[in-house]
Amino acid sequence: MTEQIPTIEYNTENTERADGKKLARVHSIESFGSVDGPGIRFIVFLKGCTMRCQYCHNPDTWDTHSDQLMTADELLAKAIRFKSYWGANGGITVSGGESLLQMDFLIEFFRKAKAQGVHTCLDTSAQPFRRTGVFFEKFEELMQYT
């Protein structure tokens, strides 16, 4: 008999402000990381993951609810304060949880980071990845800025 894996609903409430700006559910921020991409990184850990891996490094990020909601502008302003530490190879890494669950935010955030010449990295298991439909269209857009 095969065990059924439960479906986990992703909480999509409060992901956009009244003015249309996307909000990220942020778990935590590391301002000086050296293992999550090239050079010195500003690392953003987003909330939400449906995989529940037994040996997950960040199980506290699984839950999608967060008291820390931030716009791309707010998060980028916080990151840019540390830009002088990044050197030529550093930048911003977004991790999680599963970062692709907040795709709309990522597109906006990485687009704004690239406009300021910031190197970006995405840490993902790609679990929600689909090579069809709206997801793939958004993923292709995100890759332009990653």
Show the residue positions of the predicted features.
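N-terminal [4Fe-4S]-dependent radical SAM core
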Residues: 1-45, 52-66, 81-88
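Conserved Radical SAM active-site core
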Residues: 24, 40, 58-141
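Non-cysteine beta-strand/loop elements that form the S-adenosyl-L-methionine
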Residues: 143-146
